[in-house]
């Protein structure tokens, strides 16, 4: 089989490439450039991020070592259009966006995958910790969680187009991270011990404030208020805060611990309240993407953030939205984040959280 592999320059994609070669596939590597190299040279890199010049060098070295052709693919234009601009826009709307989910949908498993398939490849592969399996229950291939639940990345795949699943391969999904590193070490791949990417690739210094400043937007301080309208402190720019956050603002009225309950962008206000006020009985999410056919009402488990606990829930479809009701209240349901839905370890799909239901 002819397989195009997304090679980031990290250990996961390197081992995915290696495993496919061992299985006898005809393989070519593709490396994305999401930003110009000068961007990473100018920025202070506080956390390991993907797509830097060193990652490109590593990807080329891996491909050379394994004896495969590599092509550098310029995705800067679509990355800005589909990831950076919506991220900026959502922040200013008071949302907490998840750029990695949008990158997967529109760039890696969108533009890049199309680019690969249009070259005549049979399948597209990456180093994600997830599995592609045929489901007897749903009568089609589905995405399942990776066996290493600590590293499972299925959540980030919740909004890719369902037809693409038929053409995807995730070789790493049946291994743990430790096993992947061991395979790399035994194969002599030089990135076997390379640090994982930990932050948003286009914010290598980890500062939302600096990102917005670079985009020509200066944050303004504003009032921190209770739901009753009492001013209890100051915030340093509403895009810096997310639901459930309890640090990073200036409290002027002490005696209570405050958590971010919501934001009012048009008034430059952040609303804070008690802990119990940031637990939610449900949510409304919009623009759902379903990988399988689902009924108008069904039970499943829902994850509202990458690291959130899975919550048993009832989902009701309505127009281009879904209403989700949890069995037990869930902490910090956050507009802009992704609600991913599972049947056991099978990913059913995902939608963008519009609002929490208290």
UniProtKB/Swiss-Prot annotation:
Tell me, in one coarse class, where this protein mainly resides. Answer: cytoplasm
Cellular component, GO annotation = cytoplasm
EC category: transferase
Annotated catalysed reactions: S-sulfanyl-L-cysteinyl-[protein] + uridine(34) in tRNA + AH2 + ATP = 2-thiouridine(34) in tRNA + L-cysteinyl-[protein] + A + AMP + diphosphate + H(+)
Keywords, ordered alphabetically: ATP-binding, Cytoplasm, Disulfide bond, Nucleotide-binding, RNA-binding, Transferase, tRNA processing, tRNA-binding
Q: From which residue to which does any coiled coil extend? A: none
Query: Which residues are listed under the site Interaction with tRNA?
Result: 128, 337
Binding of ATP occurs at 6-13, 32, 127
Q: Does the keyword Repressor apply?
A: no
Residues the record marks as active site: 103 (nucleophile), 201 (cysteine persulfide intermediate)
Can you tell which superkingdom this protein's organism belongs to? Answer: Bacteria
Matching entries from CDD domains are given as: MnmA_TRMU-like
Q: Region Interaction with tRNA: what ranges?
A: 151-153
Would I find tRNA processing among this entry's keywords?
A: yes
The subcellular localization recorded is: Cytoplasm
| This enzyme's EC code(s) | 2.8.1.13
Q: Name one GO molecular function term.
A: tRNA-uridine 2-sulfurtransferase activity
Instruction: Mention one GO biological process in which this protein takes part, according to its record.
Output: tRNA wobble position uridine thiolation
Note the InterPro entries from the entry.
Answer: MnmA-like, MnmA-like_C, MnmA-like_central, MnmA-like_central_sf, Rossmann-like_a/b/a_fold
Cite the Gene3D superfamilies for this sequence.
Answer: Adenine nucleotide alpha hydrolases-like domains (2.30.30.280), HUPs (3.40.50.620), Translation factors (2.40.30.10)
Report disulfide bridges, numbered on this chain.
103-201
One of its Pfam families is tRNA_Me_trans_M
What does the similarity note say?
Belongs to the MnmA/TRMU family.
Known function: Catalyzes the 2-thiolation of uridine at the wobble position (U34) of tRNA, leading to the formation of s(2)U34.
Could you tell me what this protein is called?
tRNA-specific 2-thiouridylase MnmA
